[in-house]
């Protein structure tokens, strides 16, 4: 339990493709860049300090520039000394004492693997064989004022103790019961693009699993959420939503399965590893989750079901993207795979812009498949949310966006129900939603986004998980849809058993909330990358409402690229 272990955990929670502080080959190596970043505070300063010390810049010089207390800089120095020491060994030669020290200082298995030149899984097996395991401690919610026992845990590494009878133990305060357990993966750090809507889904999913008789276990790392209230789940692990931490908790608790579809893209990205390690995913399987994300496979599914979609292509390099551009025609929407909130998405209108954006994306997210879609200029955007049990589909809400197609769905004002879609279009949306949900073998929630042009409904994408619009629909219709969906995932409820009685007179409008006053230098124009930090709900009796007229005027707005 040290400052550096805490700092490592904090940086592992950020989801920025870093494994902690240092030891991942992603640091700065240019002296001028490091000095400039130390002089001008930025979000990554916590990493730059490590790079500066490793480069040989003195602690006094760093203190002089940053005014950070020498004590903290010495903590960094001890980390670098440990990294240098470990890097001299191979996995077979490293001692238990040195490996334990690395874990106590917060280094992830992936970082240690980088130092030793081996795989993360090999480091994990090595420490397990040496009995170097996480122990879980109760968070003192009363700051030692009086004794309080709450099921609110964090992990750390301790030296084992030997009892008089020779038994070796470590003190673990998380006691495992013999009840059937379900783990719900949280949404991780709240940031622009992934906010409190997914936390709503996690909380209601936990409550539904509890109603079904399961011991509920929540894993999340953000203290500003309801899911991290210690009385929401039976057990709360306040840990990074990071593979190593999750796998250790799963091995400790041995749950019936893990729910990944309520925590947004953060949780969904871990589905592949859960599947590879034979851990049961509750609800929609990894195969179906991956099929929806794999543009090639998903387009084949759409073709088989005779569902139209915009022309698209997949590129791994800038050269491939430029070749694709000749086939797709501009404007083109460029986006990486497995991202939320439109991170890295951009509309490009010529080859120069396309090449520059693709090169930039591949530097930030190496080895990522880039999806290139022909952008349907002037189309109307709509989306549908549904619950499916693998046999039947219940569409819980269809929303029409007021802003033009191309504005991220999180930034759009949207009406529930739609205000301007004809019967032909609505029937296409219903038919497409039913076909896709069943073809993907969805068990739980699914969100599908559509572009409508000349009375034809095109599929933009399908996400077999909770979307940020589900809480809005549940609030507007006064129905516990996440509760229903979770019980469907657990096999305790069928879609045909759901009593669907939405209660809404008039229209509900989802309105994004922006924080541009906090970010004065940010481009305020809307586009495919999400910029809103929240949302509100507006109820109107009819379309003659003045507030609706004001919103509707935005339909002709220009998009930012």
Question: What residues fall within each predicted segment?
Answer:
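Anion (oxyanion) recognition and catalysis
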Residues: 53, 210, 275, 303, ...
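Conserved N-proximal alpha/beta basic substrate-recognition cap immediately N-terminal to
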Residues: 234, 244-308
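ATP-dependent carboxylate activation and anion-phosphoryl transfer catalytic cores
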Residues: 1-97, 102-106, 129-134, 148, ...
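A generic structural signal for short coil/turn motifs at secondary-structure boundaries
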Residues: 192-195, 289, 469-473
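A conserved helix-loop-beta module that forms one wall/lid of the active-site cleft
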Residues: 284-345
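C-terminal amphipathic alpha-helical interaction region
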Residues: 111-157, 161-163, 167-171
């Amino acid at each position: 339990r040290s400052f550096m272990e805490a700092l490592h955990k904090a940086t592992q929670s950020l989801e920025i493709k870093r494994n902690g502080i240092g030891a991942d080959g992603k640091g700065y190596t240019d002296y001028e860049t490091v000095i400039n970043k130390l002089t001008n505070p930025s979000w990554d300063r916590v990493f730059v300090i490590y790079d500066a010390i490793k480069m040989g810049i003195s602690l006094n010089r760093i203190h002089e520039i940053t005014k950070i207390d020498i004590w903290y800089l010495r903590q960094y120095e001890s980390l670098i000394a440990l990294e240098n020491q470990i890097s001299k060994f191979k996995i077979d030669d490293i001692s238990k004492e040195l490996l334990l020290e690395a874990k106590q200082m917060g280094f992830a298995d992936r970082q240690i693997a980088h130092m030793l030149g081996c795989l993360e899984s090999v480091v994990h097996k090595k420490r397990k064989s040496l009995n170097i395991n996480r122990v879980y401690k109760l968070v003192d919610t009363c700051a030692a004022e009086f004794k309080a026992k709450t099921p609110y845990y964090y992990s750390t590494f301790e030296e084992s103790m030997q009892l008089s009878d020779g038994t070796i133990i470590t003190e673990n305060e998380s006691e495992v019961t013999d009840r059937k357990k379900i783990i719900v993966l949280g949404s991780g750090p709240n940031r622009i693009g992934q906010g409190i809507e997914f936390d709503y889904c996690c909380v209601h999913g936990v409550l539904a699993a509890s109603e079904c008789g399961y011991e509920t276990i929540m894993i999340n790392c953000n203290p500003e959420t309801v899911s991290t209230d210690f009385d929401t789940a039976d057990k709360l692990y306040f840990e990074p939503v990071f593979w190593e931490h999750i796998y250790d908790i799963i091995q400790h608790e041995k749950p019936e399965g893990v729910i990944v579809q309520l925590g947004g893209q953060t949780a969904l990205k871990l589905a592949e590893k859960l599947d590879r390690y034979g851990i049961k995913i509750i609800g929609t399987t990894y195969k179906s989750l991956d099929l929806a994300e794999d543009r090639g496979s998903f387009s084949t599914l759409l073709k088989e079901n005779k569902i139209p979609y915009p022309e698209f292509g997949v590129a791994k390099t800038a050269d491939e993207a430029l070749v694709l551009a000749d086939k797709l025609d501009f404007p083109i929407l460029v986006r990486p795979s497995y991202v939320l909130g439109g991170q890295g998405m951009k509309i490009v209108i010529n080859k120069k812009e396309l090449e520059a954006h693709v090169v930039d994306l591949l530097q930030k997210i190496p080895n990522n498949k880039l999806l290139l879609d022909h952008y349907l200029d002037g189309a109307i955007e709509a989306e549908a949310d549904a619950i499916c049990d693998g046999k039947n589909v219940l569409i819980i809400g269809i929303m029409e966006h007021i802003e033009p197609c191309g504005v991220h769905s999180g930034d759009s004002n949207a009406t529930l129900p739609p205000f301007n879609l004809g019967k032909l279009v609505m029937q296409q949306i219903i038919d497409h939603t039913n076909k896709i949900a069943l073809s993907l073998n969805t068990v739980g929630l699914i969100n599908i986004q559509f572009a409508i042009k000349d009375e034809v409904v095109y599929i933009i994408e399908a996400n077999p998980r909770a979307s940020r619009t589900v809480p809005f629909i549940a609030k507007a219709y006064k129905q516990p849809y996440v509760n229903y969906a979770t019980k469907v995932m657990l096999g305790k409820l069928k879609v045909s058993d759901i009593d669907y009685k939405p209660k809404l007179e008039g229209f509900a409008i989802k309105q994004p909330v922006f924080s541009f006053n906090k970010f004065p230098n940010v481009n305020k124009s809307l586009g495919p990358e999400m910029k809103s930090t929240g949302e509100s709900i507006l109820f109107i009796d009819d379309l003659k409402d003045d507030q609706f007229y004001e919103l509707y005027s935005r339909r002709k707005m220009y998009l930012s690229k």
